[in-house]
Amino acid sequence: MNSSAKTASAPDSFFTATLAEADPEIAAAIKGELGRQRHEIELIASENIVSRAVLEAQGSVMTNKYAEGYPGARYYGGCEWVDVAETLAIERAKKLFGAQFANVQPNSGSQMNQAVFLALLQPGDTFMGLDLAAGGHLTHGAPVNMSGKWFKAAHYTVRRDDHLIDMDEVARRAEEVKPKLIIAGGSAYSRPWDFKRFREIADSVGAYLMVDMAHFAGLVAGGVHASPVPHAHVTTTTTHKSLRGPRGGLILCNDEALAKKFNSAIFPGLQGGPLMHVIAAKAVAFGEALRPDFKIYAKNVVENAKALAESLRGNGFDIISGGTDNHLMLVDLRPKGLRGNVSEKALVRAAITCNKNGIPFDPEKPFVTSGLRLGTPAATTRGFGVAEFKQVGGLIAEVLNAIAQADDGKAPLVEAAVKEKVKALTNRFPIYQD
């Protein structure tokens, strides 16, 4: 076959070859990950399982299109259909959260928060956020993060006795440091946020209030968690986690002048062409969250979290703050003489996926930790209810009690037995069936 014939036939393969045919190594990795998700209990609080419709949108031809700018004002031609997708995403997000303005272009939670900083702060300005060690987030001023390197972060924390945020202390701290921005929200705080009081404190010192609801946005959308949107100058959230969409970010506000600042901060400030396939998938997820059954889902997420926390407490584990009012909890492992890193690995061997996590005033290093963070969104999506989460609490206790006994011969047997129980449980609630 001559070279011209080879060139002519290449497009046939390019447009028709399956992934398994074109790249068997990646296909094998994806198949392996599908198997892992099917047969493990996912308890990482920041993870969820998206619908087949979201997967289809994210894997669509929208990935081919460059669309710098915003609907109706692009720097490229041929944007009529991606404009439809982005406009649907914007309008659905506004309706879902009761906001007047929405930017659906942030590629991630970190970038959405960076956009707020870019729009509202100058390098060196002071802002306040919950300390990472108390349940905050890297982008809320951790020293290793851009937010902590470029700006002056003054953190508030939780009380030692009950691990709750002391709003009087937040007010005192704000009066002391006079921040330009105050952030409410975090990645490992299991109790309600007093958004009204946060806004009052922000107003008292002339600060903007930003609420990062990345973790509990799905609960807000489902009506089982108070909404920060009426109180905050700006609300940010990821679109995955409890919202059950593709990985990405979202910025909401009710002020047109601020909305223009945030739009400019995203493009051209931080990003170029938006990921239109992801934005299409966001639109699908927002549409799903607007349906009545999503309210049932959100209610179940919280009920399941409470059931899991109570099951663990009944098995002798301490839960930070005594329980949970949202989708997650922190387990204090110190009464069992365990550390987070060892416990995480043992549970993974038993097909229960979670993450080690620092607890407030943790004496251990971040890669060791004294705690585990557990969440219920993913397993709730696949159909687990209160009964199943009570069972999961017992399975976790079996694994951790075995390693706490320091019997090297017993622990592997327990982990293997629990793994079989997990397999039986997950088989009752299958995902992505062929």
UniProtKB/Swiss-Prot annotation:
CDD domains: SHMT. It catalyses: (6R)-5,10-methylene-5,6,7,8-tetrahydrofolate + glycine + H2O = (6S)-5,6,7,8-tetrahydrofolate + L-serine. It holds the Pfam family SHMT. The modification N6-(pyridoxal phosphate)lysine is found at residue 241. Pathway: One-carbon metabolism; tetrahydrofolate interconversion; Amino-acid biosynthesis; glycine biosynthesis; glycine from L-serine: step 1/1. One of its GO terms (biological process) is glycine biosynthetic process from serine. The record marks 240 as: Plays an important role in substrate specificity. Its main location: cytoplasm. It is an enzyme of class 2 (transferase). SUPFAM superfamilies: PLP-dependent transferases (SSF53383). Keywords: Amino-acid biosynthesis, Cytoplasm, One-carbon metabolism, Pyridoxal phosphate, Transferase. Homodimer. Belongs to the SHMT family. This is Serine hydroxymethyltransferase. The lineage of its organism: Bacteria, Pseudomonadati, Pseudomonadota, Alphaproteobacteria, Hyphomicrobiales. The gene is glyA.
